[in-house]
Each structure stands twice: as structure tokens, then as C-alpha cells.
């Protein structure tokens, strides 16, 4: 890993420990990313409870849109009780020019929740990078996929003021 890239640490915590340990983890790391999963589960509830910023990826499919709508109900209920929780929806695996992607984009823009202007397209480089144990920026730094990630990260830094 290049010394120019930030150090990344990965760990897995059971749902019951996530809320309790979140503050201690935040003290140790500048940025903490919690993958809460794609379904409304105990772990997803715990991840929302431990978070102060949510990135909610949404794939352009009926099943994913329905699941995201259910998840947003949980998120918005939590946001109503707290003033330290923010977030945004990120279109993921978007395919330009397809009717399903266009319908999905239109639908999420109608929801009462912020949507990132940048999106992640459906590029093979994302999957290949994972197979290599790398980020797409490491794997193919000049690829369209890497450009997508970099644009999204710049927007995220601005939104979160990191």
C-alpha cells in the first residue's frame, strides 16, 4: 500500500457491541466506516445508532429501492430524536441511459432525504479491485471507476466538512 494512502483498519463487531464501543472507536480513528448491511436488521439499527453520518448506497432495482425506503423510515425516526445524525443517498451500480437507472434516480430524488450528486457507475474495475484486495483507486487509478470514487469522496468531504 502506498505511503500516500491513509492507513485503513478493518474489524467486525457484533451488533450488541456496536453502540457501546462506537465512542471508543471514534477516539482512536479519524474516520470510522460501519457497513450496516443492506437489510433492516439488528445490525443496521445498531449502525444507525452508532453513526453520526450515513452513506446509504442504493442500487437501481425495485427490490433495493423498496428496502431503502424501509431503511429510511428507521433513519428518519432516529434523526428526529438526534441532531448529530446526517447522511445522503448514493446511487450505486448506475448504468447511464437505461430506463431502470433513470427511474431509480427519479424516485430517490423524490424522497425527503439528501442525495449525492455524484454516483458510482457499474464498472468491472470495482469487482476486480476487490478480488485483488485493493480499492479501485489503487487497482486502476486512472479508470472511470476510480474517477467516480474520487468525485464522490470530494463531495463527501465537503458534505461532512472533514
What are these regions (language model features)?
Residues 95, 106-134, 149:
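Beta-strand-loop-alpha "switch" segments that mediate conformational coupling across diverse proteins
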Residues 68-81:
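Conserved C-terminal guanine-recognition region of P-loop GTPase G domains, centered on the G4
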Residues 1-38, 42, 81, 106, ...:
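P-loop/Walker-type NTP enzyme "switch/lid" segment
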